Amino acid sequence: MRLFLIFTFIVASLASVYGCIPAANPCRGNAKCCGNYVCKNGRCLPRS
């Protein structure tokens, strides 16, 4: 569980640096994924 929190923190800091979450990274809710990706099933996946 602690590892997950650290991981979430890293992703959150990535998002604040890039302004979006890189593809294939974990995301929550309607987080903004980079490029043509959307947050699906907890990950940034290509928009189908």
Curated annotation (Swiss-Prot):
This protein's domain notes: The presence of a 'disulfide through disulfide knot' structurally defines this protein as a knottin.
Signal sequence region: 1-19
GO molecular function terms attached to this record: calcium channel regulator activity; toxin activity
Subcellular localization: Secreted
Tissue: Expressed by the venom gland.
Chief site of localization: secreted
Protein name listed in UniProt: U-reduvitoxin-Pr5a
Organism: Platymeris rhadamanthus (Red spot assassin bug)
Function according to Swiss-Prot or TrEMBL: Binds reversibly and blocks P/Q-type voltage-gated calcium channels (Cav).
